[in-house]
A protein has these predicted regions:
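S-adenosylmethionine
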Residues: 1-369
Length: 369
């Protein structure tokens, strides 16, 4: 009810009556009167007036932004730290989290081009992934290309991760052994499988839960992808993979625009446990990749503890070479992508690139030291 009053054009009288009636229909006793009183109080002022009241005594600029954009303060501060020298963009970033994102489709490589998919769906081609198509709205599940498995629903940033993994330069021939160490629920595995098929490669997928393993198997049906249920920290695989993707479990702070309620379900204390897991998965990947092979580490979070800190620690190893992702990450038209920062890792942003805030870094095994 408060959302309708403050964020939509529904009339105050209609919004109040609707939710009072809902309380009565649910047989909530006197709750209907309480709902009526609260919503009528909310309706007295618009959103800006309520925000002004909430931050009347708050002087810290980041805290004021957090209140005004409905973000926990710890998340706003983490984003400001991640932006670094570009921290002046924080208002745009937080506003992007509160805006409705476009629907992103991925044309399946080898089956349909982004140009064809855009013509069929009425969408527009993306600028970062050569397979991306954007739609302003709609239910993609009802679209023929999606139903026919010619396209999938996938944020363009996630597509870029898979593309980067397939393009990263190896030392020596690509023997066609690719590994997706955290494959569930299967979005990137589908893209990797299609890219692998075009390169004559195969993908091994690892997922810790049987349920998510089944999801990946269903999603990648017909592709050269074989999925196993195992713990990615010690999956029991023979080393020697040419390419390994670690799409690490993370806080998901980069996808708050798609799951706005998630910001209130997470705490700063959650991060450290995730970092321990992320480091262990990356260590496992570096054991499994062959000398000259590449590990692509990615998170859907811009939090520095989950991104740069993890990579810097791994890069201290004598057998690891940190690659500049920007050098093999060109846009859909083959030109360099703007706004990727100073490297060697890449951080995408919703307010800059129109994607979730995906982070990616590439590490190449140099030898067996």
């Amino acid at each position: 009810g408060s959302y309708q009053l403050l964020y939509t054009r529904i009339g105050a009288h209609a919004a109040v009556d609707l939710h009072v009636e809902a309380a009565r229909t649910a047989d909530l006793g006197r709750a209907g009167a309480f709902v009526n009183a609260v919503l009528r109080k909310v309706a007295v002022q618009d959103l800006d007036a309520w925000v002004a009241i909430l931050r009347a005594d708050v002087t810290d600029p980041v805290a004021r932004l957090a209140i005004g954009t409905a973000h926990p303060e710890w998340i706003a501060r983490a984003f400001a730290e991640s932006l670094g020298a570009d921290a002046a963009e924080l208002p745009e970033l937080l506003a992007a989290d509160d805006a409705r994102p476009k629907v992103h489709l991925a044309a399946r490589p080898g089956e349909i081009s982004a140009e064809e998919l855009a013509l069929i769906t009425g969408g527009t081609e993306g600028t970062l992934s050569p397979y991306a198509v954007h739609l302003d709205s709609g239910d993609p599940g009802t679209m023929e290309p999606v139903k026919d498995r010619l396209a999938t629903v996938q944020d363009e940033g996630s597509q870029v991760v898979a593309v980067a993994m397939s393009r990263a330069p190896l030392v020596g021939e690509d023997g066609g052994r690719w590994l997706d160490l955290c494959a569930g629920p299967g979005g990137k595995a589908v893209m990797l499988g299609a890219l692998a098929e075009s390169e004559g490669a195969t993908v091994t997928g690892i997922e810790i839960s049987e349920h998510r393993t089944d999801l990946v198997r269903a999603a990648t049906k017909g592709l050269p992808v074989k999925v196993h249920t195992a713990d990615g920290r010690d999956p029991g695989l023979e080393p020697g993979f040419d390419r390994v993707l670690v799409d690490a479990p993370c806080s998901g702070l980069g996808a708050l625009r798609r799951r706005p309620e998630a910001r209130w379900r997470k705490t700063a204390a959650d991060i450290q446990g995730l970092v321990v897991l992320q480091r262990a998965l990356l260590d496992s990947a570096l054991r499994l990749v062959r000398p000259g092979g590449v590990v692509l580490y990615a998170t859907c979070s811009p939090h520095l503890s989950e991104t740069v800190s993890v990579i810097r620690e791994a890069a201290r190893r004598p057998d690891v070479e940190l690659l500049d992702v920007r050098e093999f990450l060109t846009g859909a038209d083959g030109t360099p992508i703007e706004g990727l920062g100073d490297g060697p890792w890449v951080q995408l942003w919703p307010h800059r690139h129109g994607t979730d805030a995906m982070f990616m870094a590439a590490l190449r095994r140099s030898d067996d030291a």
